[in-house]
Amino acid sequence: MAIMQINFYSKMLKKNTTILAILPVDKPDKKFQKDVDSENLKTLYLLHGYAGNYMDWLCGARIVELSMRYNVAVFLPSGENSFYLDDEEKEEYFGEFVGNEIIEFTRSVFPIPQKREKTFIGGLSMGGYGALRNGLKYNKNFVGIIALSSALIIHKIAGIPKDYRNAYASYNYYRRVFGDLNSLIGSDKDINALVTKLKQEKGSIPKIYMACGRDDFLVQENRDLFNFLKNEGIDVVYEEDEGGHDWDFWNKYIANAFEWMSKVSD
């Protein structure tokens, strides 16, 4: 097992950024052989939630254990509070960063598979939304999406007034992150619209694993998305259980997600 912190210059963010790499190499009973074993790996780009950073998954979940057990290389980037969307004013393109640039960078540096059918994106809360949005927008890069307790908030913030404020942020934040809030529905930030567009274009739609706790304040939005995806004929698994918006729930269901991931093929 190798855990590495990598600092590199991102062209999409126009600054140095840090990612954490967890690689299941050199197991106690078997030495890693790049030419043979790299193609047996799967790769997961795993996104943190609001107010988090690249350390969240390492500190909060059993990611190292799961990486070893399921033979998955895991990469943990920092998305700040961007919802993993592009900010054209600041020229920080977090969507392009997690949807494309980080895949190209890690494939050029690490002994990981180069193929879509081995590549997944996932996340929790804000990161669950980011995984869904960018997994669909950059669908040619990902065979599967893991979305836990996803922050599917666009229908709540679409068209909000300028004096709007909730427990998390204000109109100014949502306007900065999501752009014109009156044009949000139907845009490429709308998960439903992305699915509809891919179906119309006959694009390859990644398989999706979703989970949310019954006591989570986002549970109805996650139910609604699951029902939409199911009605659209998308290959989606949804699990709901007792629990809230916390690491107790995410620890249980990221393990289920790894099990699901082990069975996914293109």
From Swiss-Prot:
Q: What is its EC number?
A: 3.1.-.-
Q: What InterPro entries does the database record attribute to this sequence?
A: AB_hydrolase_fold (IPR029058), Esterase-like (IPR000801), Mycobacterial_A85_antigen (IPR050583)
Q: Which SUPFAM superfamilies match?
A: alpha/beta-Hydrolases
Record's keyword annotation contains Hydrolase: yes
GO terms for molecular function, please?
acyltransferase activity, transferring groups other than amino-acyl groups; hydrolase activity
Keywords carried by this UniProt record: Carbohydrate metabolism, Hydrolase, Polysaccharide degradation, Xylan degradation
Q: Which domain of life is it from?
A: Bacteria
Which GO biological process annotations does it have? xylan catabolic process
Name the chain's protein. Answer: Acetyl esterase
- Gene name as annotated: xynC
